């Protein structure tokens, strides 16, 4: 906002990439081992310190335990039994950020990781469950190796959280995963538009509903962060997560000014366009403009 405010003083156009809490949605049809592998890769790359890292997981309660266990196994496979001793595992950028992240963790809700080393500014890949929107970890962009998992369950349905018209089909009924998808859409749309969104599902209708009704900068179906890696598509946010896009041709166009130029030939000229206009000219102009 400060950049935009300063640029506005000089009428300078801007492109802003502002980050945000990027959701990772996993429904009951997802291939969990593969989903876990790709979530762990995207979340813990550079210790979660990337603008498009999955910030939190929304999942169906029916698969939560299996998903969390698969994520736990993938963390061990990718980073070893003790990630803090892995020389290839990164560290938090500075002490201030390190202590901010520790303040977001809740030991009672931590089911994986939670260890840290203040001397090396390292925090182990951490997973938290039974998280609510009121928890500190959901109050800001995490930008670190902490993955909260929120679940859809019967209690949410009883409160009416999932009852909306976003995802009903032509008959007015929900698909097998419809209630969960409704809830996920509501969760995303009730918060600032994220920079990225990731959806793991084998249900094509559910995929279309998520893409049609969620506002976000960019994302992936059945993967994480790789949309950022191509120069063939623009990258950027929307709303609270930014404006404009760049990468490849889109970046060139974003930072270019297109001028409209007419190179008019001089070997002929149509006098009909010039004053004075009489009845004959008016008829000809009207016929021409049709």
Regions found by a protein language model. Name each.
Residues 1-133, 151-176, 221, 289:
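ALDH superfamily catalytic-core signature
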């Amino acid at each position: 906002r400060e950049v935009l405010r300063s640029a506005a003083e000089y009428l300078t156009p801007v492109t802003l990439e502002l980050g945000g809490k990027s959701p990772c949605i996993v429904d009951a049809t997802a291939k969990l081992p593969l989903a876990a592998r790709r979530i762990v890769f995207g979340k813990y790359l550079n210790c979660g310190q990337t603008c498009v890292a999955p910030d939190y997981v929304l999942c169906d309660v029916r698969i939560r335990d299996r998903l969390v266990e698969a994520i736990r196994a993938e963390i061990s496979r990718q980073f070893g039994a003790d990630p803090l001793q892995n020389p290839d595992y990164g560290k938090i950028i500075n002490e201030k950020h390190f202590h901010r992240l520790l303040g977001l963790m809740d030991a009672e809700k931590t089911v994986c990781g939670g260890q840290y080393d203040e001397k090396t500014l390292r925090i182990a890949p951490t997973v938290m469950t039974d998280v609510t929107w009121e928890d500190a970890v959901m109050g800001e962009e995490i930008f670190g190796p902490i993955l909260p998992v929120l679940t859809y369950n019967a209690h949410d349905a009883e409160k009416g959280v999932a009852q909306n018209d976003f995802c009903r089909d032509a008959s007015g009924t929900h698909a097998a995963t419809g209630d969960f998808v409704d809830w996920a859409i509501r969760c995303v749309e009730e918060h600032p538009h994220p920079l990225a969104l990731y959806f793991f599902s084998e249900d094509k209708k559910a995929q279309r509903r998520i893409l049609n009704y969620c506002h976000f900068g960019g994302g992936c179906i059945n993967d994480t962060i790789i949309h950022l890696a191509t120069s063939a598509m623009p990258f950027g946010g929307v709303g609270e997560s930014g404006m404009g896009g760049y990468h490849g041709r889109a970046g060139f166009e974003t930072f270019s000014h297109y001028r409209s130029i007419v190179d008019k030939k001089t070997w002929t000229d149509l006098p009909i366009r010039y004053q004075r206009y009489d009845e004959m000219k008016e008829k000809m102009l009207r016929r021409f403009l049709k």
